A protein has these predicted regions:
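A noncatalytic interaction/capping subdomain that flanks phosphate/NTP-handling catalytic cores
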Residues: 1-134, 139, 153-154, 164-317
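A conserved segment at the C-terminal end of the G1
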Residues: 145-157
Length: 317
């Protein structure tokens, strides 16, 4: 089941923090695109993944946001409570690490969109010959599969496989990554053989995923901190639609983003003020890029060739 988010008051936050405090065994500060995020937990399996996933932060820096991650029999499974004033999130009975790291990124996004004019995009971002491509879509549409398919080409470099931050600079959009390593699926190597052996079988968690250093496969120079975004491909999976690929007008692309919650289920606050902010950011994003809609009901290779055709790349072979 998906997790549920409830907004809480600062007073409720204080009560929950006091309740969790005696159980805290691990306190880790990490840097996520300039934000200091503090993880507090008693789960011995969590710190290793977290520290492999995100860059370390000096312990002398005060945190901008906090994540408490604990089991609690008094709470339902996958319960998230968030105080937007102190930027503190409580995750109770959330065992899937993918949600832990996405909520951490969502917490950073909440801070950055309010205070620095920086937007969050739940999607993959790669650089091909100096031009940035973003792929977004609902869960299961294939953005991760197609991202790693593109990385098989030596001219492709990756910024992020799941989440990036974007900022307007004049006529351009700069896209920034924030993760040290990526949380990948075990079945990736079944689709693209180049990734076979990247992670030992016993290192995958119960969800069939692991935090992996893809530099071992693609090389150290192919993980970039940023790129200039020029193209957005929105992925969908609709077996009833025979059309595979089509360009989108700006209004069509904006409508798809807004109707689908910006393709981001990890936004912690959804209210009229935040919606106005996000509509403006996404409008800026779309207004400075070429947008396409791609139906991914074909084979991974067929979809990969369609993505490459947009970029003027040779077929996937």
């Amino acid at each position: 089941m998906p997790y549920t988010i409830s907004l809480i008051s600062p007073e409720e936050k204080e009560q929950l923090a006091e309740r969790c405090a005696p159980r805290v065994k691990y306190e880790i500060k990490s840097e996520i695109f300039g934000c200091c995020i503090k993880l507090l937990s008693d789960d011995r399996a969590l710190p290793g993944k977290w520290q492999e996933n995100f860059y370390p932060m000096s312990q002398n820096i005060r945190s901008h946001g906090r994540l408490f991650v604990f089991s609690d029999p008094s709470c339902a499974e996958n319960t998230v409570r968030f105080d937007p004033y102190s930027k503190t999130a409580f995750l109770f009975n959330v065992s899937y690490y993918g949600w832990v790291k996405s909520i951490a990124l969502g917490l950073c996004g909440d801070i950055l969109e309010d205070e620095h004019g920086i937007s969050s995009v739940h999607g993959a971002c790669v650089d091909v010959g100096g031009n940035g491509l973003a792929m977004v879509g609902i869960s299961g549409a294939g953005k991760t599969t197609q991202t790693y398919g593109l990385l098989r080409d030596p001219h492709t470099r990756i910024i992020s496989d799941d989440w990036f931050f974007a900022r307007v600079f004049g006529p351009e959009i700069l896209a920034y990554g924030s993760e040290r390593n990526f949380y990948i699926r075990q079945d990736l190597s079944a689709i693209w053989k180049e990734y076979d052996g990247l992670v030992a079988a016993e290192e995958y968690d119960a969800d069939g995923r692991a935090v992996a250093d893809i530099r071992w496969v693609v090389g150290k120079g192919r993980l970039l901190p940023l790129t200039t975004l020029s193209t957005i491909i929105i992925l969908k999976r609709d077996a009833a639609d025979p059309q595979v690929l089509c360009p989108l007008e700006k209004g069509e692309a904006l409508d798809l983003f807004t109707r689908n919650g910006y393709f981001n289920p990890h936004l912690l606050v959804r209210d009229p003020r935040k919606t106005a902010l996000r509509d403006r950011y996404i409008s800026d994003l779309i207004g400075r890029t070429d947008c396409y809609l791609l139906n991914t009901t074909g084979t991974p290779k067929t979809t990969q060739d369609a993505v490459r055709s947009v970029l003027g790349m040779p077929g996937s072979g």
